[in-house]
Regions:
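Cap/insert and terminal regions of metallo-dependent hydrolase folds
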Residues: 56, 63-65, 74-168
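Conserved acidic
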Residues: 71
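Binuclear metal-dependent hydrolase catalytic cores
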Residues: 1-67, 75, 149-173
């Protein structure tokens, strides 16, 4: 299945190089559980069409729940599984910060990438509807953006500031 997805990504996203897509993949069912010591992990399919096999994850300890959206547009599966999470870690496509670049990033490429991710004007709604306590944003597209503006957009729907994720960030749950 991975070969067909790899081919689809290259064609759909109009990538110049496919070197970053060469890695080993292990496939599993659409939904299920994994237990690691005292942590129960639920994996569930999210909507990243046309690319198949995208998953979110909920981690359960005795008293806490952390949900990771995975690469997805807003979808029912995420909303169900993220309910009442102490932390929702969610990707975000910051559409107002990304522009066409001649020969590199076409208008169609931007449209196609936005189509299967969660735009900044919707991620706060997802967090609010999931009733999460904290929202941590990550997997930023583009990687450089106005943090204050993003927080303001998300706060409008979520009702509080999101946490802007970064490498090695520690969050008390």
């Amino acid at each position: 299945a991975w070969k067909s997805e790899r081919k689809l990504r290259i064609s759909y996203e109009r990538r110049k190089s496919s070197k970053a897509l060469n890695y080993k993949v292990y496939e599993f069912k659409k939904e299920g559980f994994i237990n690691i010591n005292d942590i129960k992990i639920k994996y569930f399919e999210v909507d990243h069409k046309p690319v198949p096999y995208a998953y979110g994850f909920s981690f359960f300890s005795k008293k806490k729940k952390l949900t990771i959206s995975g690469d997805t547009r807003p979808c029912e599966s995420l909303m169900i599984n993220a309910q009442n999470s102490d932390v929702l870690l969610h990707e975000v496509f910051i559409e107002y910060e990304i522009n066409q670049i001649s020969g590199l990033r076409s208008k169609k490429t931007l449209h196609n990438v936005k189509e299967y991710h969660t735009p900044s004007n919707l991620v706060g709604k997802v967090a609010k509807l999931s009733n999460c306590k904290k929202l941590v944003l990550t997997h930023f597209v583009p990687t450089r953006f106005n943090i204050s503006k993003l927080k303001k957009i998300v706060r409008k729907d979520f009702g509080k500031d999101p946490i802007i994720g970064n490498d090695l960030l520690t969050i008390n749950i």
